[in-house]
Amino acid sequence: MARPKEFDRDQALDRAMHVFWSRGFEATSIQDLVEAMGINRGSLYAAFGDKHALYLAALDRFCCTVGDVEGALGAALRDSGSAKAAIRRLFMAAVEAAANLDRRGCMVVNTAVEFCPDAGDIGAQVALAMRRTEAALHGVLLQARASGEIGDRVDPPALARYLTSSLNGLRVMAKTTDDNAALRDIVDVTLSVLD
């Protein structure tokens, strides 16, 4: 008879996500993970496989929760009714998150810096997250163009790539400074392309 699980898998995964997000992959030991997750090594390996597989699961969890750009943009668009305001809210959320999360940055961006370009399946997951961010921004920009919020001279695919790159750069900058006024200045200058 199989022994029942003695822990909440989702809660353990959330805890692992926070450890990896704070420390990165290389600096996180299995001991760090079992202590944070409140489980033993055998349970970790049985439930998640190895450290690499657990990292992939934690990164996916981040993308579906904290780092859900599509959801954040959709909610901001519904709340404000303005594509430009929704994009601004996304950028300002990155500034606010930096201050509220001990300057951890974005787990996806941190992973890109730690692993890429030769990161195999982890790199593929990072690339997918970046494409999803770009696609979400592209969709909002198309709505902005259709509603007349931005002009016809704007190329939505190119602008979505630019905004994705700028958002990721902002997330890196937010790790290096506690000067939120400077970060807001970066947002203002970046988003001036929408005017």
Which residue stretches match the model-derived regions?
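N-terminal intrinsically disordered/low-complexity leader segments
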Residues: 1-7
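Helix-turn-helix
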Residues: 11, 15, 19-53, 57
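Hydrophobic alpha-helical connector segments
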Residues: 57, 71-104, 156-163
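Amphipathic alpha-helical packing segments from all-alpha helical-bundle domains
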Residues: 67, 85-88, 120-146, 158
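Amphipathic alpha-helical segments used for helix-helix packing
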Residues: 85-86, 100-121
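Amphipathic C-terminal alpha-helical segment
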Residues: 97, 118, 139, 143, ...
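Hydrophobic alpha-helical segments that form the core
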Residues: 104-110, 136, 152-173, 186-192
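All-alpha amphipathic helical-bundle segments outside canonical DNA-binding/catalytic cores
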Residues: 124-129, 146-162, 180-181, 185
